[in-house]
């Protein structure tokens, strides 16, 4: 476990390899004055005309008919929310669809690098399946193919054709089709969904995933954790990636740690360098622990 005193809250002028985990199973002195948030969701109608599924290749989700001039309706969040108030995982039959992990975060934060690292670490331990989301390309799926993350038949690509968060929360149908296709053809024990890059307000529907990981990176500056948003405050695990860039961008890892703890309360977070697999074993521990809890308490298969 990480001792927050290891690197303090001063400036960091040298490289850090923070592959330790903050799981907050012990008491902390938290600054709760500004940390309490409440999420208010307002439902809006969605009339989406969708494309079609292309076998094992990819799914299209295009031609959205919307009510707002800017493109489509959104959930409106008055506050970033508390970790303790996040949506609870659904009790469901995991024989119908395997335990599903959703990985989200801004563009360039390292989501695909994390997916690749997870595939490399877990593919010899259990059968996997991956669904990627991009707006108009299959770039992330192609990256996984080039790097031989998994056999091609275990990867599906969804082209959302619009804002990525809609495909993981408001209209999850195309991702569900891709996940069901993987279940039918390769019978994975663990499924991973990678969202397209989006903003701090993006969060997965619990109808789609059982466990959420939100990835931010140091290159965005040490202010990112305190900006909040459901991804920061209510993901099951927050990953602060690319810690090696801290001295190059003037980011203070101590400040990021302090703010992540303040914003997340008891919610776990950790530092990582996913492209070097630093922190990845700890991420896997969190995933497998959640998977064991969910599958041992799941209702019996029908």
Curated annotation (Swiss-Prot):
InterPro entries: CobW/HypB/UreG_nucleotide-bd, P-loop_NTPase, UreG. It comes from Sorangium cellulosum (strain So ce56) (Polyangium cellulosum (strain So ce56)). Residues 1-76 are annotated as: Disordered. Homodimer. UreD, UreF and UreG form a complex that acts as a GTP-hydrolysis-dependent molecular chaperone, activating the urease apoprotein by helping to assemble the nickel containing metallocenter of UreC. The UreE protein probably delivers the nickel. One of its GO terms (biological process) is urea catabolic process. One of its GO terms (cellular component) is cytoplasm. Residues 1-32, 40-56, 64-76 have a biased composition (Basic and acidic residues). Gene3D superfamilies: P-loop containing nucleotide triphosphate hydrolases (3.40.50.300). It is found in: Cytoplasm. It holds the Pfam family cobW. Keywords: Chaperone, Cytoplasm, GTP-binding, Nickel insertion, Nucleotide-binding. Its main location: cytoplasm. GTP binds at residues 105-112. It comes from the Bacteria. The lineage of its organism: Bacteria, Pseudomonadati, Myxococcota, Polyangia, Polyangiales. This is Urease accessory protein UreG. GO terms for molecular function: GTP binding; GTPase activity; nickel cation binding. Facilitates the functional incorporation of the urease nickel metallocenter. This process requires GTP hydrolysis, probably effectuated by UreG. Belongs to the SIMIBI class G3E GTPase family. UreG subfamily.
């Amino acid at each position: 476990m990480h001792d927050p005193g290891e690197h303090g809250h001063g400036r960091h002028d040298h490289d850090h390899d923070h592959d330790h985990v903050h799981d907050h199973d012990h008491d902390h002195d938290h600054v709760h004055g500004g940390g309490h948030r409440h999420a208010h969701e307002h439902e809006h109608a969605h009339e989406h005309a969708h494309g079609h599924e292309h076998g094992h290749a990819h799914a299209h989700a295009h031609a959205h008919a919307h009510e707002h001039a800017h493109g489509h309706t959104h959930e409106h969040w008055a506050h970033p929310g508390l970790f303790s108030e996040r949506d609870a995982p659904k009790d469901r039959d995991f024989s119908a669809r395997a335990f599903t992990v959703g990985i989200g975060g801004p563009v360039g934060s390292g989501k695909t690098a994390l997916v690749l690292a997870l595939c490399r670490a877990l593919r010899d331990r259990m059968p996997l399946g991956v669904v990627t989301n991009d707006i108009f390309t299959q770039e992330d799926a192609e990256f996984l193919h080039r790097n031989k993350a998994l056999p091609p038949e275990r990867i599906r690509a969804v082209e959302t054709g619009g804002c990525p968060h809609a495909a993981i929360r408001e209209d999850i149908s195309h991702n569900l089709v891709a996940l069901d296709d993987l279940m039918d053809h390769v019978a994975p024990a663990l499924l991973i969904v990678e969202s397209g890059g989006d903003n701090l307000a993006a969060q997965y529907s619990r109808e789609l995933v059982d466990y959420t990981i939100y990835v931010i990176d140091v290159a965005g500056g040490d202010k990112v954790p305190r900006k909040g948003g459901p991804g920061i405050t209510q993901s099951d695990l927050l990953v602060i990636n690319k810690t090696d860039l801290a001295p190059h961008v003037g980011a203070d890892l101590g400040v990021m740690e302090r703010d992540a703890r303040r914003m997340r309360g008891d919610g776990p977070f950790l530092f990582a360098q996913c492209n070097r697999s630093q922190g990845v074993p700890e991420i896997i521990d969190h995933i497998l622990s959640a998977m064991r809890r969910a599958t041992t308490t799941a209702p019996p298969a029908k």
